[in-house]
Amino acid sequence: MAALLELEGIRRSYQSGEEIVDVLQDVSLTINAGELVAIIGASGSGKSTLMNILGCLDKPSAGIYRVAGQNVDELDDDALAALRREHFGFIFQRYHLLPHLSAAHNVEVPAVYAGLGKHERRERANMLLTRLGLGDRVSYQPNQLSGGQQQRVSIARALMNGGQVILADEPTGALDSHSSVEVMAILKQLQQQGHTVIIVTHDPTVAAQAERVIEIKDGRIMADSGSKNEPVVAAAELMSLTPAAPSWQQLVGRFREALLMAWRAMSANKMRTALTMLGIIIGIASVVSILVVGDAAKQLVLADIRAIGTNTIDIYPGKDFGDDDPSTRQALVHDDMAALKAQSYVSAVSPSIGGSMRLRFGNIDVAASVLGVSDEYFRVFGMAMEQGAPITREQVERQAQTVVIDLNTQRRLFPHMKDVVGQVILVGNMPATVVGVVAEKKSMFGSNKALRVWVPYSTMANRLMGRSYFDSITIRIKEGYSSKEAEQQLVRLLTLRHGKKDIFTYNMDSLLQTAEKTTQTMQLFLTLVAVISLVVGGIGVMNIMLVSVTERTREIGIRMAVGARSSDVMQQFLIEAVLVCLIGGALGISLSFAIGLIVEMFLPNWRIAFPPMALFSAFLCSTVIGVVFGYLPARSAARLNPIDALARE
């Protein structure tokens, strides 16, 4: 008869300080298929180490171990996991059930790693539990079951993938006498069905029930009774369970099950999961809120600047602001305005002549800023009218004594009058008819309290100031033309006309660009602060996951014992970290929506928009945080030695 398990000259040594301790010495053993074997020995005799080597949980330091003719030393970690998953079933003294899973889910765990389908897996688990007398307790948690019932769940788990070889470590050690008898009867029945059953015990009464007893002492086999009866070699009904599903379906199924297991693990520690998410929620909400609220603030600033007049260029006499050289003060004249208006890139032109004068109506006398402008001035600066109409070309040509006032002036001169068009006021000493009132512009910079009025520039020059030159000329560039290139061309034009460069310009687009750059810089700074909070949240996730790995070390050992590969363990903990971060990210985005609504409630002029790219980036960021900060705990879990993990309390 071909041997199922063969050990030749097995030695297992451990480093203990500076000394090397031999736990197993020159162990040679052959176990045939269908045998019921008991390995008996006192505590420290090496029997548990021998069982770990037989179950491929550990490797010998020397010697050869073959399973069905295959040298175990030639197998990598994944192949060893496959061997445990497909051929071995473990029954532990302390049951080693996962506390957050039901009895049925505990039994299903080995089949999850074998890639068995969900429905087939569930039917098989229920069938095994029913066969072992637990059909009415499939949904019970381990803490709702007695010791004997928990051990039967452990037996069902060992049989889930076939359990060609059943390794039972002190299976009756934690049970009462009645439960012990039941468990031993089940193990004998499994041997009769064709399973190879190996029991490790220190109890001679338990060992005596086996057909073959092997005594071990101080790491050496002292006695081997040999098999009393011819072993049953008929194939067990549950031996072969090779899933027929294609590999990609197995991968999808494993990922789905890992996701479910991650969710169950998170649900088992709701408070800790919520506190872990809190850092991610705050971080994501901060980043998204700063992006969208910052963008709303930026758009409001730019809108205010555009209201002043975008795509416009102001031309001033002299070299720069504050230049009071008399030779350049009169540089800008009417002919310059006409020459500029003829340029192809110019949409509108308006000269400006300014001064401070007294305004009077009845017995009210106030100081105001008076500006002489052309009919195109109001279009250049995008100014709307509250009442009446702006200055017209006809009024400019005939030096009309007309005036346009702002709302501040209306409130001061006409405090009890709503319609003021047609009223006559004194501008300086000149009577002027009010033809329009400029509408007030809402601005985040606040309201301007100064009084301003506008008259035709021809009226200002000839009737009020008595001069023919302008203080400045403002031009509006046509859409589609580069403001910078237009600025260079008009400077070149006026320099040629004047024979020298006696003017300077101020491009409003440069103010717009400066404001945009400044707001972007501030937004970037605030975003970096928010990202720091997100990183802190990620570190919190890593910290909690490392704690979780430590707390769940025995669970990791159980999963490895039933066939989980290192990659399966790593995948599960990575998925848990990513799931925490994704849910935290979703809640963070929801919080940022609430923040946006509150901002709009208190600041109605702000338009909060959540672009899809920002939301996608937030979810991507959550995923990356989960992967980056979940990798170290996941790797730590995957690198655990199953023997050490199972021994951890």
UniProtKB/Swiss-Prot annotation:
It is found in: Cell inner membrane. GO terms for molecular function: ATP binding; ATP hydrolysis activity; transmembrane transporter activity. InterPro entries: AAA+_ATPase, ABC3_permease_C, ABC_transporter-like_ATP-bd, ABC_transporter-like_CS, MacB-like_ATP-bd, MacB_PCD, Macrolide_Exporter_MacB, P-loop_NTPase. GO terms for biological process: response to antibiotic. Keywords: Antibiotic resistance, ATP-binding, Cell inner membrane, Cell membrane, Membrane, Nucleotide-binding, Translocase, Transmembrane, Transmembrane helix, Transport. Residues 5-243 form the ABC transporter domain. ATP binds at G41, A42, S43, G44, S45, G46, K47, S48. Its EC number is 7.6.2.-. Pfam families: ABC_tran, FtsX, MacB_PCD. Its main location: membrane. Coiled coil: none annotated. The chain crosses the membrane at residues 274-294, 420-440, 524-544, 578-598, 608-628. It comes from the Bacteria. It is a multi-pass membrane protein. The keyword RNA-binding does not apply. One of its GO terms (cellular component) is plasma membrane. Belongs to the ABC transporter superfamily. Macrolide exporter (TC 3.A.1.122) family. NCBIfam families: PRK10535.1 (NF007826). Part of the tripartite efflux system MacAB-TolC. MacB is a non-canonical ABC transporter that contains transmembrane domains (TMD), which form a pore in the inner membrane, and an ATP-binding domain (NBD), which is responsible for energy generation. Confers resistance against macrolides. Homodimer. Part of the tripartite efflux system MacAB-TolC, which is composed of an inner membrane transporter, MacB, a periplasmic membrane fusion protein, MacA, and an outer membrane component, TolC. The complex forms a large protein conduit and can translocate molecules across both the inner and outer membranes. Interacts with MacA. This is Macrolide export ATP-binding/permease protein MacB 1. It comes from Yersinia pestis.
